[in-house]
Regions:
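Membrane-embedded alpha-helices of multi-pass transport/permease systems
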Residues: 6-11, 42, 57, 64-86, ...
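Hydrophobic alpha-helical segments of integral membrane proteins
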Residues: 23-38, 70, 77, 104, ...
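Glycine-rich helix-loop "coupling/hinge" segments at transmembrane-helix boundaries
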Residues: 49, 126-161, 180-187
């Protein structure tokens, strides 16, 4: 998820209509569409074929899949920001980086972090599935426990996954509530 976040932020800057030039927006959106079209399990099969049956193949598969979705989410978060502040900063002499840093990023950041947590939750669940095709991680462990009928260990791993996903779900909900409160207070101030 970490690698996907970094790659997605870079791609999203080019994919956001309010930030990138038109030719780059089209190219980046097309790239994100292609990546998102392929399910994570297929990315896992491709990665296992290219890298062998190991955890690195699982990381590569989830990174590619997550990049497609996070890139789209991030570019939409950037586009949802009211550009008045960024334009005002440019008007008083700020460069593009400063305009982004102070005019766009602070407003998009809460939504972006919420998407990051959601993707982390998704990837933890997906790791269980893609491991079944040899991409390492929790799924490979679950598959081994199933093969040897070690149902107590199988259940323990599933229970741990459930706990982690539940904690991440609560954390994501907390962030979404903070976003809603912040947006509500900003609306009240602008009236």
């Amino acid at each position: 998820t970490f690698f996907a976040i970094i790659i997605s932020l870079i791609i999203a800057l080019g994919a956001a209509q309010t930030i990138g030039p038109r030719w780059l927006v089209f190219s980046m959106r097309m790239l994100l569409n292609i990546i998102r079209t392929i399910p994570s399990i297929i990315w896992a099969v491709i990665a296992v074929a290219a890298m062998g049956a190991n955890a690195l193949a699982g990381v590569a598969a989830l990174t590619l899949y997550s990049t497609g979705y996070l890139g789209k989410f991030f570019s939409e978060a950037f586009e949802s920001v009211d550009m008045k502040v960024a334009r005002s900063l440019r008007g008083i002499g700020a460069d593009s980086l400063q305009s982004f840093q102070y005019g766009i990023w602070p407003h998009a950041k809460p939504l972006i972090w919420s998407h990051c947590i959601w993707m982390l939750e998704y990837n933890i669940r997906s790791a269980s599935i893609i491991g079944y095709v040899g991409a390492g991680g929790l799924g490979l462990q679950l598959h081994a426990y199933q093969e040897f009928h070690q149902w107590d260990r199988f259940a323990t791993v599933l229970f741990c996954i459930l706990i982690v996903v539940t904690v991440l779900d609560f954390l994501s909900e907390h962030i979404r509530r903070r976003i809603a409160r912040r947006d509500g207070s900003n609306d009240a101030l602008s009236d």
